[in-house]
């Protein structure tokens, strides 16, 4: 399956969604590795108070509202991983200070992505993350999906 999808269950149920609005995505992986097992073990003992705003993301996609998509991001694993690896929070903060509409850890970490409206701002964030030696690998991607027929 191609394009934007909603994954449910353990990823086995995929539902096609409207495309992601045109944007730039900055991806930064710090020079660490994270044990997914450790994250899930600690998650079980952690109280989860906030959950991703799935409805907000779905509405943002439907309305092609990039700000709403970015504002609705959430990852319940992030709290656990950031406690063990504060560099993840530093990367997010750097991206947000550089103009990201939203930034979030991907999966159980350690990779962080930031959503940017334009390439200039995303490149500035790329330069800042690199200058602070926060990430070992940094990539900039252009998202420009076309609507499904």
Language-model-derived ranges and their functions:
Residues 2, 7-102, 117-120, 126-130, ...:
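Conserved, helical-rich catalytic subdomain that frames metal- and/or nucleotide-binding sites
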Residues 104-105, 114:
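Conserved SAM-binding loop
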């Amino acid at each position: 399956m191609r394009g934007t999808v909603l994954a449910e269950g353990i990823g086995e149920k995929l539902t096609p969604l409207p495309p992601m609005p045109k944007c730039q995505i900055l991806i930064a992986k710090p020079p660490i590795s994270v044990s997914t097992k450790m994250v899930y073990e600690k998650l079980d003992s952690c109280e989860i108070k906030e959950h991703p705003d799935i409805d907000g993301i779905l509405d943002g996609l439907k309305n092609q509202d990039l700000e709403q998509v970015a504002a609705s991001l959430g990852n319940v694993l992030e709290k656990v991983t950031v406690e063990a690896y504060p560099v993840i929070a530093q990367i997010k903060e750097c991206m947000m200070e550089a103009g990201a509409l939203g930034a979030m850890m991907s999966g159980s970490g350690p990779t962080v992505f930031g959503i940017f409206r334009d390439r200039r701002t995303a490149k500035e964030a790329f330069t800042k993350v690199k200058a602070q030696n926060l990430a070992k690998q940094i990539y900039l991607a252009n998202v420009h999906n076309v609507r499904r027929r």
